[in-house]
Amino acid sequence: MNFAEVIVDVSTKNIDRPFDYKIPDHLKGMIKTGMRVIVPFGPRKIQGFVTAVKEASDLSGKSVKEVEDLLDLTPVLTEELMILSSWLSDKTLSFKITALQAMLPAALKAKYEKELKIAHGADLPPQVERLFSETKTLLYSDIPDHETLKLIQRHVQKGDIDVTYKVAQKTNKKMVRHIQANASKEELAKQAEGLSRQAAKQQAILHFLISEPEGVKIPAAELCKKTDTSSATIKTLIQKGLLKESYEEVYRDPYQDKMFKKTEPLPLTDEQRAAFEPIRETLDSDEHKVFLLHGVTGSGKTEIYLQSIEKVLAKGKEAIVLVPEISLTPQMVNRFKGRFGSQVAVMHSGLSTGEKYDEWRKIHRKEVRLVVGARSAIFAPFENLGMIIIDEEHESSYKQEEMPRYHAKEVAIKRAEHHSCPVVLGSATPTLESYARAQKGVYELLSLKHRVNHRVMPEVSLVDMREELRNGNRSMFSVELMEKLEETIAKGEQAVLFLNKRGYSSFVMCRDCGYVPQCPHCDISMTYHRYGQRLKCHYCGHEEPVPHTCPECASEHIRFFGTGTQRVEEELTKVLPSARVIRMDVDTTSRKGAHEKLLSAFGEGKADILLGTQMIAKGLDFPNVTLVGVLSADTTLHIPDFRSAEKTFQLLTQVSGRAGRHEKPGHVIIQTYTPSHYSIQLTKTHDYETFYQHEMAHRREQSYPPYYYLALVTVSHEEVAKAAVTAEKIAHFLKANCGADTKILGPSASPIARIKDRYRYQCVIKYKQETQLSALLKKILEHYKREIEQKHVMISIDMNPYMMM
């Protein structure tokens, strides 16, 4: 093959297509679809993906540039993933390069560097020449200041300095230095004997190697530790020819120091067996089917997953298990590693870039056959997939909010169709869309209505916080919750307290004039964080110190409103001074391994109360937890989002599911200011069916999913009028060109009307069947492409929005 079609690493509308490159003779027969290459593009060299190799090019009459270099020896993307990338960019209206990069770990994304080189015979002033190394090269990033940059620029224009563009990977393979003897044991003994007393450390190394088996290789760090020596001693012995060194690649394994207790399959209950049987039959017949496994919390869904995977692996096939990021607890990893050992790769955001890269390479090299991971693990480069499982399928974190804005569930179904294998969606509170599909027979519904071993569902009490206020209780803890906490701790049992937000106090307010500090770049109030006494914007990252006086009226009466985890922790220590509390939130778990340490400490009984935000709502299973308290059930209910009632019911049901999962019965106390709302009322009886009927009636009335599909077009500009006018034109174009059944809402200012100094307007498109919608939206992007490329106007399109803010 003589030519390669390459998608280059440039995210603009004009360049969103394959370019032809000539394959040089020395790379012929080596370049394959799915490989990464370095190609010249304009004045620079950039990374690209090979989408096809072919005999001839339509441009063969013109001068076609050559592929510069090959970055891979085997394709990093399989043929199936290459096809999937086209579907993904089409479905999400994203650039082809963006879709391709979404499938790979960050380590494989290119790092670009400009290198400056002194031209032959150039005469440079000493202050410039001094900056260049012995090889007469200098990295652009190493230029010390603007004055030097100006000087260098002049010499580049004169031709004294050449500029070249380099492409590198972000992470390298981890290589470990190994040491072994370079002589026989007799020779080593003889040399050791001839050494003086001053060379005792050299003797120690030689004696150690004499005691080891012949030809053994030992990591240099281990050798130094065992013989109490340094690398300088090793270097001396290498120079003497007695030792030799070699470098071997090792994986960065986040679990290498952990022992996983081997587990055996558990006997299934009759209900579990009835749910497992249809999955087993589908696996045996190699057909594609989507199952919705609707099982109450603690009903044994994980055991069904494990036994299904066992079947898949026994057939020599591979499996993907997706778990929400916050459910990827050590407990969850233990379940899969305990059953399948070294066949498991784990991928989540807690791993370093290098660790993620190494887990991906285990999959790519076919060294593992099961991946357990968060959203992006759906792109694991398996070529013989036998099953995909999505646990907690209702979780909104399966939807990516940046381009490409894909939903992992849709990608899973697409991949499973290709591999002719089943998808299992599991949840105690499925999305209305999934449950409606199961009711229509698009998915097959499997139900688990009881907890395993006949354990009862926890008793749920609702506490009306308005009544508490009327009765003079101004505390964030109701009388009932305080009594239950004291009783639980007195019995030596544990409690989980859940708060539906993060941070210390939600906002700061002046009690005299009502002023609330807003982010200067976004239309959103700043969040107060007590550690460091800072106000932070969670949208753009802006930070500032807490004001001591009001910037508006100079009053000193500044008050902190809201109840964040830090504040709750302080209150707890006042009202229950002897209680041991572990707080889990973004601040306490930001350091690597902190999440695991805190959960292990709680599991070992080192605390009475686990206090936290969303991250403690799922996947935790502690036998001694008998009480769950929800401090603020209403937070998610009052967000301007058509899914707010659904999210509230899901969250409260999931949190309630943490109580009484073993022998001891559980109790849940939910504090609320809106106890009559059906999403809160129905949590009491764990009644998903009734909630589904209620919410479906509301969605039908309001023309929301699953009755209609949604698309969201958001326009932003630094000038409010430009954003509004552009959004108005887009809405007008859509209204004129969409079908009569399609509804266009807006344009209106987005709920958060300004982020990072850009004003935001949005249009919501509600449609049942709109075959031309994708083409119409592409036309809009095409029409505004110049303004978009110049960053004047930004238009984002979300074909299945989960965030309406």
Curated annotation (Swiss-Prot):
Monomer. Component of the replication restart primosome which assembles in this order; PriA, DnaD then DnaB. The preferred DNA substrate mimics an arrested DNA replication fork with unreplicated lagging strand. Interacts with DnaD but not DnaB. Interacts with SSB (sbbA) via the latter's 35 residue C-terminal tail which tethers PriA to ssDNA. Colocalizes with DNA pol III subunit gamma/tau (dnaX). May interact with RarA. It comes from Bacillus subtilis (strain 168). Residues 167-253 are annotated as: WH. Residues 111-166 are annotated as: Linker. Its cofactor is Zn(2+). Zn(2+) 1 binds at C510, C513, C550, C553. Changing F19A: Hypersensitive to methyl methanesulfonate (MMS). Belongs to the helicase family. PriA subfamily. Its EC number is 5.6.2.4. Zn(2+) 2 binds at C519, C522, C537, C540. One of its GO terms (molecular function) is DNA binding. Residues 545-699 form the Helicase C-terminal domain. Between 50 and 100 molecules are found per cell. Initiates the restart of stalled replication forks, which reloads the replicative helicase on sites other than the origin of replication. Recognizes and binds to abandoned replication forks and remodels them to uncover a helicase loading site. Promotes assembly of the primosome at these replication forks. Serves as the initiating protein for assembly of the replication restart primosome; binding of PriA to an arrested DNA replication fork with unreplicated lagging strand triggers assembly. Sequentially DnaD (possibly as a dimer) and DnaB homotetramers bind. This is Replication restart protein PriA. Binds 2 zinc ions per subunit. GO terms for biological process: DNA recombination; DNA replication; DNA replication initiation; DNA replication, synthesis of primer; double-strand break repair. Residues 1-110 are annotated as: 3'BD. Its main location: cytoplasm. GO terms for cellular component: cytoplasm; nucleoid; primosome complex. It is found in: Cytoplasm, Nucleoid.
